[in-house]
Each structure stands twice: as C-alpha cells, then as structure tokens.
C-alpha cells in the first residue's frame, strides 16, 4: 500500500512538473506590438515595417499585434486632441502582454518617452525619432534615426542628370519640416550635378488623399514645368505616379522606402530604399534570441550600414550614370562628401564647391 502511495505521489509530481514546464514554455513566447500612422499597405514606409515584422513572426513564432492610428478627428470622440488620440491607441495595444513595442514615425517621439517611464516592463523602439536634445532616452527605450539625406543626395543627382526640364519637383505632406533632411540632401544632389537647376517644393494638405496628390503632380508637371517629382507624402504621394503614367514616359518620379518601379515602370527612374523592416528585424531578433535589449541610446543608420540605398538600374539610367552614382556613394560613405541635412548645412555645402 505504501509503495502504491509513493508511486502515485511520484506520478503526480512528474505530471505537475510537466504541466509547469509546459506553462513556462508558453509564457516565453515573445509578444511584439507595432503602432503606425497610416496603412501598413502603403507600398512604402509602413509596408517596409509590415514586411519586417511579418518575417519576424514567421521565423521566430512570436505573437504579433499591429495597429494603425485611427483617422483624426475620431468619430464620437471629437474633443480628443491628436496627442490624446495617439495615446489611447497606444494604450489599446498595451492591453496585451507586450515584450517589445515599436512606434513607427516621428509623431510618436514624445509619446514614446512618456510610455517608457509609465511601463518599465515593456521595451520600446521609436522609428524616425526627433532629436531629443538634452532629454535622456529611457533605459527601456531605443530611438532610431536615419541619415535620409545621404540617399536623397544621390536621388537629386540622378534627377538632375535625367531631367529634360530646368526644374525638379519635391512634394511633401503638411508637416514638411520633418522631412528637411530629405529636402536639403535632395537639393544638394541637384546642385552638385547642375547648379542651374531649380527645386520647386509644394506641400499637400493631407497624407491620405491620392486624388489630391495626382492633381498637384499634374500641375507641377504641366504648369511648373518640372521634369521629375520626388514625393514624400504617404498615400497622397501615390497620386504622383498616376499623374506621371497619365502624361507619359517623359515624366519622371523618384520612389521612396521600397523599389517602387513596379508602380510606374516607364516613369520611375530610381527609388530610395529605406529598409526600416531590416532594422526592426535585427533589433527584435537579438532580443528574442538573447533576451537582451540595449536601450537608453539613439541609433543612427545610413548608407554605410546598408540600411539606406539607392536603386541603380543601368537599363533606366545608363552605365556612365550608374558609375557616377557608385562613385558618389563611396565618397559619402568614406566621409569625403558630407551631405547637408538642413538649410544652414546646405549653404555651407554650396560655399565649399
């Protein structure tokens, strides 16, 4: 009887240990949240994020929670400010047992600091963060910035060499000050190739109006007489491709975030590839594998790190121009060319040529 009691007791202990172990394995599953401003299927910025986190899910079996900010003003909550609405959406994602939380876009810069201090149990990553200045990045947070001006310089050089007109177009959303690194890098590339060319800059009132983007692009091509347009305007920017296709193969576009030549094969002369998904995948996979998160810092990425690059298709450009772009690329990586990211830096850049 005593032996039977011992056997049953041991069996229960083994079973209990098995159940406990099974539970701990389940709790070890990493949960990653992603909050973005706009659709994850924008064929550009957010699409790159989406591709990176889906690859992460498929390769590591993580639980992935994605959410797009609700269009503002929010129906039924019109008294909410933009910041309050963003915070509500972030809290909604944080109802899940998150390990990592990625906030996509400069709009989340201030919010990421607030959330990090409120929830020290979650690790945060902010893509395209503001310059925090004297503000210390929290230990459980990581700010990632990109040297967008480097690839924009190469795009500007290509635009100047390919344009059949004396003007180049630059189309942004309503908050254009947040893409000034793109603008002045692009402007510097144009100036480096041909100082006589002029940059025509326009601001769209929204990032979500494709028809407005098309109308503005048609005006820029036909009335402003630009030969190339570089749009940084979200969904609105996709309207530029429609306008270029409608007008014909002599009207050029520069793609952004992904190789966008498939959208308008006869019009896209190059694309800036900004592989945000690659950065998110790299940092997240390091955490998943080692349970290590190196927070409290700002990470800077550009051409040298292979995160940003420019498409150099010899069938579109020509071999000579491709060689010139590769040479400029190497000079930027080596530091021989310092690309400006502001108006002051651009004026300094011009003075040294």
From Swiss-Prot:
* Keywords on record: Cell inner membrane, Cell membrane, Lipoprotein, Membrane, Palmitate, Signal, Transport
Membrane topology per the entry is:
Lipid-anchor
Q: What is said about its interaction partners and assembly?
A: Monomer.
Chief localization class? membrane
Q: Where is the lipid attached (S-diacylglycerol cysteine)?
A: 17
What does the entry list under GO cellular component? plasma membrane
Q: What is this protein called?
A: Basic membrane protein C
Q: Which organism is it from?
A: Borreliella burgdorferi (strain ATCC 35210 / DSM 4680 / CIP 102532 / B31)
What is the purpose of this protein? Answer: May be part of an ABC-type nucleoside uptake system involved in the purine salvage pathway.
Q: Is Transmembrane among the key words of this record?
A: no
Q: Which family does it belong to?
A: Belongs to the BMP lipoprotein family.
Instruction: Provide the leader sequence positions.
Output: 1-16
- Pfam families referenced in this protein's UniProt entry, alphabetically: Bmp (PF02608)
Under the heading SUPFAM superfamilies, the entry gives: Periplasmic binding protein-like I
Q: CDD domains this protein is in?
A: PBP1_PrnA-like
Q: Where is the lipid attached (N-palmitoyl cysteine)?
A: 17
The protein's location, in the record's own words, is:
Cell inner membrane
